[in-house]
Amino acid sequence: MYNIYSDNLIEADWFKSLNKKFSDSKVALIKSRGNNLPIIEKIISYDRPDIILLKNNKPLLVVEKTREVPTGHNVGQRMARLVRSVELNIPTIFFFSI
């Protein structure tokens, strides 16, 4: 069973629509710190990524997505989200416009 955690239900629905395997996935919003599964707490300890995909409560993927061109402050504010998942050896994808 896949679980999709997100800061935003629109993002979660977008991700869920990417693959038929996710059609029965449970979607949950990332809660405030201290109110999530322990693995979610580890992943969000620096900042909250757009998508966290779990299978049997084990992290499979972290996704960060932006429509803005990666210049200025936008890239920097997203780095903590990406760095933490990489530190935890979780595959990580960053989608952005070019």
Question: Which residues does each predicted region cover?
Answer:
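Conserved catalytic cores of phosphodiester-cleaving nucleases, focusing on short active-site segments
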Residues: I51-L53, L60-R67, L82
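Nucleic-acid nuclease catalytic cores
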Residues: V86-I98
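A short, Lys/Arg-enriched amphipathic alpha-helix followed by its capping loop at the start of a domain
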Residues: D13-K26
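A general structural motif
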Residues: M1, K58-P59, N89-P91
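Short acidic, S/G/P-rich loop/turn micro-motifs used as interaction or catalytic elements
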Residues: L9-E11, T66-G72
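A short, highly charged nucleic-acid-interacting micro-segment common to nuclease
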Residues: M1-K16
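Well-ordered, non-membrane alpha-helical segments in soluble/globular domains
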Residues: H73-R81
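Active-site metal-binding core of divalent-cation-utilizing nuclease and nuclease-like domains
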Residues: Y5-S6, K26-N56
